[in-house]
Structure formats: structure tokens, C-alpha cells
A protein has these predicted regions:
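Asp-box/BNR beta-propeller blade signature and adjacent active/binding-site loops
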Residues: 1-223
Length: 223
């Protein structure tokens, strides 16, 4: 799910609309809006229906100009995380971006950005969860960051890494970062991190909280 407050103070709560208890159940994307701080909510609004394909892991980002970006993954019909393949053709995960300029009342048609944000060797990729951010300070002020994760390898050699989708033009074009480093000084990536969230701290540093994809420790924090 993704929950944001727009520049006009409207609450937008968006999530997967599931018909079955399954991550990949031909999910739609559905939304409710609140203009009174959450005391009352609109009727359920269908934002995106991909037919038998599945919409997963929606992430909204509120931009300084009031636009709301919606980033989500599209999995082929009946294909789960372990069943999609690397690359950009065939049975692959795809990534799409929509936007709203009226506080979520209407939404644009989706723009596919898969080749911009998906590493070619990644077997599966997805976003979030939660919300993206737009940097408020520093040399990259205005940059949009969406937390993402990638699954690389096969069988017992599978690893997951956190990274970010990056836009410097308000979401028109994107590129992706390298995997987030572990921070031990050896340049190695932060291993086995899947769903993650990003915030910008008051001193300009970025903090990421991530879910451990396997192992005894459920969550990690990275500065």
C-alpha cells in the first residue's frame, strides 16, 4: 500500500485490489481519497486494471509542483516472482508510471519505463513499499527517488539487493542506481534486502529501511 498527503492536503490511500489471497491474483490498483484528514473517505476508485496480468507494489510520490506520480510493477498473468525471467522481453516484470495533476481524481495513461529502471541481469524487480521522495536540499535538490529491489540468480544462488529508480526531470525519464552498498568499506552491496523505504533526513542524508529477504533478522536500516 501507499499513503501520501498531496500539496493541497488531500490524503491518497492506494493499494492492490486483490480478488484472492495471493500476491499475483490479477490485482488491480484501487484508491480512496480524503479531504478532511482521514475522517471520511471517497468511494473506492479503480485506478488501473491490467486484465489477467497483476499490478504489484504501488508507490506514490508527491512532487513539489503538486503532481503525484504512481509507480507500479506489472507481472504477467499467473507468473510469480520466482517465475519471471531476466531481460526485457517475454515473461518479465515490467514497470509503469502514471501521474495525477488533480489530487488523484484522474490519472494519466501509464508510461512503461522498464528499460530505464530494471537492471538487465535482474530476474525480478519491484518497488517499495510505501512512498517515494523528492529531495529538498543539496546538490541534487528536486531529484525523485523510488525505492526498489532486484532478485538476481537462480536456485540456491539467488540474492536480492535494494536500489533506487531515479528521475531528474519530474518523472519524464528515469535511470537506476547501483545496489545500495553495505557500508563496511569494502564496496560490496547490501545483501538479501527486498522491500525497502527511503526518507531524507534533516541533515540531507538518506536513510533506507529494508526487509530481509531471508534469514533471522527481519529488518535492517542503512544510512
Amino acid at each position: 500500500p501507499s499513503l501520501v498527503v498531496t500539496s493541497k492536503g488531500t490524503l491518497l490511500a492506494l493499494c492492490e485490489g486483490r480478488t484472492k489471497n495471493d500476491d499475483h491474483a490479477a490485482n488491480d490498483l484501487v484508491l480512496k481519497r480524503s479531504g478532511d484528514g482521514g475522517r471520511s473517505w471517497s468511494k473506492l476508485q479503480l485506478v488501473r486494471d491490467e486484465g489477467e496480468a497483476t499490478c504489484n507494489d504501488p508507490v506514490m510520490t508527491v512532487l513539489d509542483d503538486g503532481r503525484v506520480l504512481l509507480f507500479f510493477a506489472r507481472f504477467p498473468a499467473e507468473a510469480r516472482t520466482k517465475e519471471v525471467v531476466p531481460g526485457f522481453e517475454g515473461k518479465v516484470t515490467r514497470h509503469l508510471v502514471m501521474h495525477s495533476d488533480d489530487d488523484g481524481v484522474t490519472w494519466s495513461a501509464p508510461q512503461e519505463v522498464t528499460r530505464m529502471v530494471k537492471p538487465a541481469n535482474a530476474q525480478a524487480t519491484s518497488q517499495g513499499a510505501g512512498a517515494g521522495i523528492q529531495l529538498k536540499a543539496g546538490p541534487h535538490k528536486g531529484r525523485v527517488l523510488v525505492p526498489m529491489w532486484q532478485r538476481v540468480g537462480e536456485g540456491e544462488k539467488v540474492e536480492t539487493f535494494a536500489f533506487a529508480a531515479i528521475s531528474d526531470d519530474g518523472g519524464a525519464t528515469w535511470h537506476h542506481s547501483q545496489p545500495v552498498p553495505h557500508g563496511r568499506g569494502d564496496g560490496r552491496p547490501w545483501h538479501n534486502i527486498s522491500e525497502a523505504a527511503l526518507i531524507e533526513l534533516s541533515d540531507g542524508r538518506l536513510m533506507m529501511n529494508g526487509r530481509n529477504a531471508n534469514g533471522p533478522v527481519p529488518f535492517h536500516r542503512k544510512l
